[in-house]
Amino acid sequence: MEMSVLKLWDYWALISIIFIGIPHGAFDGAISITLGYSKKLKLQLAFISMYIFIAFVVIMFWIYFPVIALILFLFLSVFHFGLGDLVWKNSKFYLLKGYFHGGLFVFGIIFLNTSEVDIIFKILSGENLSLLWHALDTGAFIWIISCFLILFFQKSIVLTKQYIGLICIILSIIILLPPLPAFALYFCLIHSWNHVSRIYPTLISYMKKRKAILLMIGFSTTSWIMGLIGYYFILETDGFSNSILKITFIGIASLTVPHMILVDGFFRPKFKI
């Protein structure tokens, strides 16, 4: 049963997320080659199989434990967005600053648009969201503590004019725009751009530009096809708008976990970018 009707700008936001935002993660195939995981056909097949397996596990976990899955996804997003906009550093302040930065966006969108976001969360994870909101309140409290810690250690944590400008842009986005357009604008134009502009020079130093682009297109197309198949299966029971929301965000969650493992766990620490 359909719970809500999305507005026109929400549909444009979802289309942008699917066709502009998701392809930034499709460079993971090229990243695996750069890391040496796909030098041989056996390694390529093993990497792709493991990537798909992890994504499948995330989807199944979401089906059986939707509220816990959403909680984990949101907190993973805090760190992934936060760290993704920062230059990698082997520092105890790196995770702290990442939590602050990512939390500003994630918690900002949520707590500035609680009624709209609650509807989206109910579509994604059902009606009983008390545990989710308790976790978010706790996460926001920890975020406030991170703000004070950053102010306390401000001599150790350098806040450049460029970074302060980025914070102002993010604040403008989450204050002025509805939640889905705000997420789309940040995800497509800030997070995706920072990711691609950081990794691309390293990728093309290990392979031809054409190969990196073709791998990205291949991974993107595969993701879109799988999403379309999933959309077809849930359309009858969930309705048009709800199906798009579910496929978009559960799909992003399923891709974020292997993407984070590869990028934040191996690629960026190795190349220090």
Residue map of PLM features:
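Membrane-interface helix termini and inter-helical loops of multi-pass transporters
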Residues: E2-S4, V117-L132, I234-N242
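Hydrophobic, membrane-inserted alpha-helices
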Residues: M1, S49-I59, F81-L83, S146-F148, ...
